[in-house]
Curated annotation (Swiss-Prot):
Homodimer. Interacts with MYOB1, MYOB2 and MYOB3. Interacts with PHOX1 and PHOX2. GO terms for biological process: actin filament organization; actin filament-based movement; cell division; fruit development; Golgi localization; gynoecium development; leaf pavement cell development; mitochondrion localization. Keywords: Actin-binding, ATP-binding, Calmodulin-binding, Coiled coil, Cytoplasm, Motor protein, Myosin, Nucleotide-binding, Phosphoprotein, Repeat. Belongs to the TRAFAC class myosin-kinesin ATPase superfamily. Myosin family. Plant myosin class XI subfamily. Transmembrane segments: none annotated. Residues 1071-1090 are annotated as: Disordered. This is Myosin-17. Residues 1159-1470 form the Dilute domain. Residues 495-529, 531-554, 589-613, 613-635 are annotated as: Actin-binding.
Length: 1531
């Protein structure tokens, strides 16, 4: 990275900081080469200008998704961009074609669900937000399009998330090209399910990671010619063998050892295991358990994973038996023997573990002991056996343990590959490399040397690829780049792998000599590489050496290099294990042909690893590479912590900064012409105002500035390092001058405004004073006027009160007089009205009773007469029964008569009921009146008695009074009054008695009349029942005849000629109607002279049946031929659906057990819609299918349902004719098809339902399926048509350069018109489909459903694209999409609710999201306002995504406040366990949103009467019933 060349006072810069790596500040002083800056933490620091880098103050607050878009591509800019994105949970960032993945240390399931895969499928690179799926998509599409293998290299240090990234890559690749594997498992599933097994045996706890992979893994996914996965293979590299025998605190050995020690008790007992602390290979470290990990559960999970990958129970037992043997082998210790340089087992404990180890390995314990402490040397003269000292014996033990474990791991890998299966015919692969990253610890040994050697090779490959991409970019833009050079690490690789003379070669050479030590090896390195720049010798060290790698200098300790490089294959060990009685153990050590000639063979791990690495590099070189760099943001493995120093070190080690250095060696800053002019156009406004080409304008601007060394490509401006800072400095100067001019004008304006305000205030003050004086004067005048008015009103009030009292008294007197007169008049009229009502009721009752008598007599006479006539006609019909034509006519007449008699019977019943009710009511009324009168008579008698008694007492008391006192006139008058009153009461009593007597007589007469009526009613009922039974018998006979005809017709269609030959009938057989025309054969009646047709020969029966079949086939062919054409519509009713329905109903096809007409109709529909793009045909059949389905839904019912026919009775006949007649009587045709022919088909609600057989019900189901299919095809066709337009509608096209300059209103108007062109295209497509379905009379219900789902699709596509593309979450783009949505809203208004329905409501997500983008003052909005008022539909994840991706490209405003963002993050953390709620993308619903019941409820009734038959069948006699019904309806 080149230091900046243009730093001025006031510039914002990045300065190195020991704690934060880089810290930003503002330059306050420049003193030569020293820069004084005030940092954000409040300190003032001094730094060399070469180590200071400019900061882009206009960078988006959320960072950029591709760091090549950074204005300043340097180390602090990259680090700051990653930190800002990580704070917003944006863990993926591009650097060109490289993906940087920062481990979030938390679950983010919404980033990896199926819907997210669908979004990235087919999307171009960089079109959506950075994602691991985008890298896999690029690799897959490159493989498909170019036919070349691809590879994805995933690297990073332990804990950076390499394994999870690899899993996501595998998932997505399997999603694109997955196939079913063994037992229904996909290849990807099998590869992923192998992970637990490989992790158990190849992962361990290290200082930096609790689950660190101690081996490299390269997964090859093999694809066939169709792009589908056909096989896979897992290849592993450099398992850390030394960890088996040696670990440091607080690390752990491989997981499998601890899992086995935590196995169930019976397992531990079988393997004689216990606490891990008891085993030497495990107790070298004090760490035995991992936090949050249950080793017992992990052990069971590992066993289940082994089952899944195909490892049998026996093999599993053998694997863990070998693991247990290694643990016991580690506890075998040695002591000095009696002889010199000899060794023996140390104690009985060692003996015990040796015996257990031998038992587990199924080998001889004595031979194992000899193999550990003895060596056999073969010379030409003799075989020499020598013993080993304790240290050598321990080394032999450890070598055996490492060899066994290494072979076991290799066997597991081979077993997994065999289980997955490989495709030898595959020509293309996608390889996923999950390998360890660059490592540098305090103590670095042979493992770190090999790992860093691997990373050097990969870095060389990476550098070549990055430089190649730079070259391709320069070549594409046609600029001069030949002088550009980049740093290569070839010298480091030569230092390591050069042969002879490299580190590995010298190490192998030292291992070949038994007397070599780590000191001699180190001295050899010092002598060989003393002049190499990349090799240094640390001071005060005799065994350490340092190599300057691309990621930094690493110091290695050579103490254990020799031991770790030796891969002993001791002949004694080989022979011991080959002789094992366990085939599994023996199979781990196959005897190779070259090993038979020598007892001991030396193998170098370094050389072998070098060959493996060379093979890997050859594989990678033959593929197109793609890079993913995983970064661990902190060492505490917790979310939301970003340690700058840790991350910057990983960026250096991962080659990201190396890629930046390569880019900086050429042209690190690349800007399109539009972006360059938009940013730096202020430096030369005259260039923008001129009508120049963009490239010419950029050249003129750069020439005016005087910049040198730049290059202009075809579409971009390429700037050298530091030139962007120089341009920004000049731009800042221009903007500063402009700001000062604006401030000067602003201050002048503010001063003028303040003066005007003061002047206005003075004027207002004066006006207020004068106004106050005027108000006081007005108030005095107002009070005087009010006093006068109050006096006037008071006097008026007193006078009015006096007047009102007088008026009230007068009215009261008048009211009393008028009320008395009115009450008298009312009483008189009430009495008169009551008398009139009584008279009217009595006369009405008498007249009504007489009328009822006459009516009943008439009905009885009519019923008797009609019954007699019916019996007479029945006898006549029986005589003519053999005549088929006469029988049919008689049947029709009898049907009429039956209906009429039924009506009469029902009328008689109703009259009888009404008569009984009237009689009951009359009787109740009479009883009530009689009771009332009786009570009145009793009260009158009691009153008379009381009055007589009072008169008697008065008379008895009268003489003494007369004697004692003079006779007074008043007493005489009172006596006379009492006497007259008594006489009046007597007369009233007599009248009441007379009335009661009259009522008794009337009641007796009514009872007598009631008895007579009851008798007459019983007689009438008995006659009606008899008549009803006669009618039913006639109906049964007619139905039997009809049933026989129907059965004979069915038998004629079903039975074979042979069976018809065997059948003999003694009964007569009537010629049946054909189901095609409903008439009798030959147009009339055929009878023999004796009115019967005897069945004597088979041929006489075959001829009419053959004719029936042929006629039926002809009619069906004609119908199918007719409906295969476009029959159009009769009004708003589809002709084809109505014709099909009427034909099927007339032919009774719904009621037959076997027919082919349904299959032929379905086949016709299927043939018509074979072309999925013909929307005209699809809309035509959508209308017909819906109408026909509606008719079937309202007509058919399943067989066995309750019949609606009231005359149906169960029959006990067990004969075939009886059962058939019973079934036929349950159908509406049993009442007489002639009734339908005569009356025609009326509204569907007036028709009775048909008991449908299985073929009819199946036809209805097939028709429903075809309706759903046609609906889906129309909907999907419209989706396909608008999908490309939606991709253009989500982002506003860039405006022309004219919009950058003021005074271009006309050009802006033209540009604005062009902006909505895509939206108008969508509107045009919607109108086209709407008009098409209107023209074909598609049901509005289905049209609404189509457009509702289409608008939902638009909502999903626009909303998801908005959330996945940061460039779309801008203010101007929100305005653009809002204008487009207004077009769709206008379309909904024009389409009306009948066809658009609730389609506009389906856009609620994108409407609210766009509304959020275009609102002002977002930082002032609270979270409650946003969630409740602005965006109530959007989830918190969606709001967080929009808020963090928003950027204002128009006014430069910011998104919501940091507090709102923090609250959103808290709410998301609370919902982190809910995978559904974590997803911020929407799903498109492609289901069928309606049922048959919905169609039946939503569609109007269809009247099929007035449908005119098509010309093709109009003149055919077989379809005459269509014309007959039409004529009947018109008449």
């Amino acid at each position: 990275m080149v230091g900046p060349v243009n730093i001025i006072v006031g510039s914002h810069v990045w300065i190195e900081d020991p704690g934060a790596a880089w810290i930003d500040g503002e330059v306050v002083k420049i003193n030569g080469e020293e820069v004084h800056a005030h940092t954000t933490n409040g300190k003032t620091v001094v730094a060399n200008i070469a180590n200071v880098f400019p900061k882009d103050t206009e960078a988006p607050p959320g960072g950029v998704d591709d760091m090549t878009k950074l204005s300043y591509l340097h180390e602090p800019g990259v680090l700051n961009n990653l930190a800002m994105r990580y704070e917003l949970n944006e863990i993926y960032t591009y650097t060109g074609n490289i993906l940087i993945a920062v481990n979030p240390f938390q679950r983010l399931p919404h980033l990896y669900d199926t819907h997210m895969m669908e979004q990235y499928k087919g999307a171009g690179f960089g079109e959506l937000s950075p994602h691991v799926f985008a890298i896999a998509e690029v690799a897959y599409r490159a493989m498909i399009n170019e036919g070349k293998s691809n590879s994805i290299l995933v690297s990073g240090e332990s804990g950076a998330g390499k394994t999870e990234t690899t899993k996501m890559l595998m998932r997505y690749l399997a999603y694109l090209g997955g196939r079913s594997g063994v037992e229904g498992r996909t290849v990807e599933q099998q590869v992923l399910e192998s992970n637990p097994v490989l992790e158990a045996f190849g992962n361990a706890k290290t200082l930096r990671n609790n689950n660190s992979s101690r081996f490299g893994k390269f997964v090859e996914l093999q694809f066939d010619n169709c792009g589908r996965i056909s096989g896979a293979a897992v290849r592993t590299y450099l398992l850390e063998r030394s960890r088996v025998c040696q670990i440091s605190d607080p690390e752990r050995n491989y997981h499998c050892f601890y899992l086995l020690c935590a196995a169930p008790p019976e397992e531990r007992e079988k393997f004689k295991l216990g606490d891990p602390k008891l085993f030497h290979y495990l107790n070298q470290s004090k760490c035995y358990k991992l936090d949050g990990v249950d080793d017992t559960e992990e052990y069971l999970a590992t066993r289940r994973a082994m089952d899944i990958v195909g490892i049998s129970e026996e093999e599993q037992d053998a694997i863990f038996r070998v693991v247990a043997a290694i643990l016991h082998l580690g506890n075998v210790n040695f002591a000095k023997g009696k002889e010199i340089d000899s060794s023996v087992l140390k104690d009985e404990k060692s003996r015990y573990h040796l015996d257990v180890c031998a038992e587990l390995l199924r080998c001889d314990a004595k031979k194992m002991e000899d193999a550990l402490i003895k060596r056999v040397m073969v010379t030409p003269e003799e075989v020499i056996t020598r013993t080993l000292d304790p240290d050598s014996a321990t080394g032999s033990r450890d070598a055996l343990a490492k060899t066994i474990y290494s072979r076991l791991f290799d066997w597991l890998v081979d077993k997994i590959n065999n289980s997955i299966g490989q495709d030898p015919n595959s020509k293309t692969i996608i390889g996923v490399l999950d390998i360890y990253g660059f490592e540098s610890f305090k103590i670095n040994s042979f493992e770190q040397f090999c790992i860093n050697f691997t990373n050097e090779k990969l870095q060389q490959h990476f550098n070549q690829h990055v430089f190649k991409m730079e070259q391709e970019d320069y070549t594409k833009e046609e600029i001069n780049w030949s002088y550009i050079e980049f740093v290569d690490n070839k010298d480091v690789l030569e230092l390591i792998e050069k042969k002879p003379g490299g580190v590995i070669a010298l190490l192998d050479e030292a291992c070949m000599f038994p007397k070599s030590t780590h000191e001699t090896f180190a001295q050899k390195l010092y002598q060989t590489f003393k002049n190499y720049k990349r090799f240094t010798k640390p001071k005060l060290s005799r065994t350490s050496f340092a190599i300057s790698h691309y990621a930094g200098e690493v110091t290695y300790q050579a103490d254990l290099f020799l031991d770790k490089n030796k891969d002993y294959v001791v002949a004694e060990h080989q022979d011991l294990l080959i002789a094992s009685s366990d085939t599994f153990v023996a199979g781990l050590f196959p005897r190779l042909p070259e090993e038979t000639s020598s007892k001991t063979k030396f193998s170098s791990i370094g050389s072998r690893f070098k060959l493996q690495l060379q093979s890997l590099m050859e594989t990678l070189s033959s593929t197109e590479p793609h890079y993913i760099r995983c970064v661990k943001p902190n060492n505490v493995l917790k979310p939301a912590i970003f340690e700058n120093v840790n991350v910057i070190q990983q960026l250096r080690c991962g080659g990201v900064l190396e890629a930046i250095r390569i880019s900086c060696a050429g042209y690190p800053t690349k800007r399109t012409f539009y972006e360059f002019l938009n940013r730096f156009g202020v430096l030369a406004p005259e260039v923008l105002e001129g009508n120049y080409d963009d490239k010419v304008a950029c050249k003129m601007l750069l020439d005016k500035i005087g910049l040198k060394g730049y290059e202009l490509g075809k579409t971009k401006v390429f700037l050298r390092a530091g030139q962007m800072a120089e341009l920004d400095a000049r731009r800042a100067e221009v903007l500063g001058n402009a700001a000062r001019r604006i401030q000067r004008q602003s201050r002048t304006f503010i001063a003028c405004k303040e003066f005007r305000a003061l002047r206005g205030a003075a004027i207002v003050l004066q006006s207020n004073c004068r106004g106050k004086l005027a108000c006081n004067l007005y108030e005095e005048m107002r009070r005087q006027a009010a006093a006068v008015k109050i006096q006037k009103i008071f006097r008026r009030h007193i006078a009015r009160e006096s007047y009102l009292r007088i008026r009230h008294s007068t009215i009261t007197v008048q009211t009393a007089l008028r009320g008395m007169v009115a009450r008298n008049e009312f009483r008189f009229r009430k009495q008169m009205k009551a008398a009139t009502i009584i008279q009217a009721r009595l006369r009405s009752h008498l007249t009504h009773s007489y009328y009822k008598q006459l009516q009943k007599a008439a009905l009885s006479t009519q019923c008797g007469w009609r019954s007699r006539v019916a019996r007479k006609e029945l006898r006549t019909l029986k005589m003519a029964a053999r005549d088929t034509g006469a029988l049919r006519e008689a049947k029709d007449k009898l049907e009429k008569r039956v209906e009429e008699l039924t009506w009469r019977l029902q009328l008689e019943k109703r009259q009888r009921t009404e008569l009984e009710e009237a009689k009951t009511q009359e009787y109740a009324k009479q009883q009530e009146a009689l009771e009332t009168m009786r009570l009145q008579v009793e009260e009158a008698n009691a009153a008379v008695i009381r009055e007589r008694e009072a008169a008697r007492k008065a008379i008895e008391e009268a003489p003494p009074v007369i004697k004692e006192t003079p006779v007074l006139v008043e007493d005489t008058e009172k006596i006379n009054s009492l006497t007259s009153e008594v006489e009046a009461l007597k007369a009233s009593l007599q009248a009441e008695r007379q009335a009661a007597e009259n009522l008794r007589k009337a009641f007796s007469e009514a009872e007598a009349r009631n008895s007579e009526l009851a008798t007459e009613l019983e007689n009438a009922t008995r006659k009606a029942d008899q008549l009803h039974e006669s009618v039913q018998r006639l109906e049964e006979k007619l139905s039997n005849s009809e049933s026989e005809i129907q059965v004979l017709r069915q038998q004629a269609l079903a039975i074979s000629p042979t069976s018809r030959t065997m059948a003999t009938r003694s009964k007569t057989m009537l010629l049946p109607r054909t189901p095609e025309n409903g008439n009798y054969l030959n147009g009339g009646t055929k009878t023999t002279p004796d009115m019967t047709l005897a069945v004597r020969e088979p041929e006489s029966e075959e001829k009419p049946q053959k004719h029936l079949n042929e006629k039926q086939q002809e009619n069906q062919d004609l119908l199918v031929k007719c409906i295969s054409q476009n029959l159009g519509y009769n009004g708003d009713k589809p002709v084809a659906a109505c014709v099909i329905y009427k034909c099927l109903l007339h032919w009774r096809s719904f009621e037959v057990e076997r027919t082919s007409v349904f299959d032929r109709i379905i086949q016709t529909i299927a043939t018509a819609i074979e072309v999925p793009d013909n929307n005209e045909v699809l809309a035509y059949w959508l209308s017909n299918s819906a109408t026909l389905l509606l008719l079937l839904q309202r007509t058919l019912k399943a067989t066995g349902a309750a019949s609606l026919t009231p005359q149906r009775r169960r029959t006990t006949s067990a004969s075939l004719f009886g059962r058939m007649s019973q079934g036929l009587r349950g159908s509406p045709q049993s009442a007489g098809l002639s009734f339908l022919n005569r009356q025609g088909l009326t509204k569907l609600d007036d028709l009775r339902q048909v008991e449908a057989k299985y073929p009819a019900l199946l036809f209805k189901q097939q028709l429903t399926a075809f309706l759903e299919k046609i609906y889906g095809m129309i909907r999907d066709n419209l989706k396909k048509e608008i999908s490309p337009l939606l991709g253009l509608c989500i982002q506003a096209p860039r405006t022309s350069r004219a919009s950058l300059v003021k005074g271009r209103a006309q050009a802006n108007a033209v540009a604005q018109q062009a902006l909505i062109a895509h939206w108008q295209s969508i509107r045009k497509s919607l109108n086209s489909y709407l008009n098409l379905m209107k023209a074909n009379n598609a049901p509005p219900f289905l049209v609404r459903k189509v457009f509702t789902q289409i608008f939902s699709f638009i909502n999903v596509q626009l909303f998801n694209s908005l959330l996945l593309r940061r460039e779309c979450c801008s203010f101007s783009n929100g305005e653009y999409v809002k204008a487009g949505l207004a077009e769709l809203e206008q379309w909904c208004i024009e389409a009306t609710d009948e066809y658009a329905g609730s389609a506009w409501d389906e856009l609620r997500h994108i409407r609210q999201a766009v509304g959020f983008l275009v609102i002002h003052q977002k930082p002032k909005k609270t979270l409650d306002e946003i969630t409740r008022e602005l965006c109530p539909v959007l989830s918190i994840q969606q709001l967080y995504r929009i808020s963090t991706m928003y950027w204002d490209d128009k006014y430069g405003t910011h998104s919501v406040s940091s507090d709102v963002i923090a609250n959103m993050r808290v709410m998301m953390t609370e919902d982190s366990n809910n995978a559904v709620s974590s997803s911020f993308l929407l799903d498109d619903d492609s289901s069928i949103p309606f049922t048959v019941e919905d169609i039946s409820k939503s569609m109007q009734q269809v009247d099929v009467n007035d449908i005119e038959p098509p010309q093709l069948i109009r003149e055919n006699s077989g379809f005459g019933f269509l014309l007959t019904r039409k004529e009947g309806s018109t008449s």
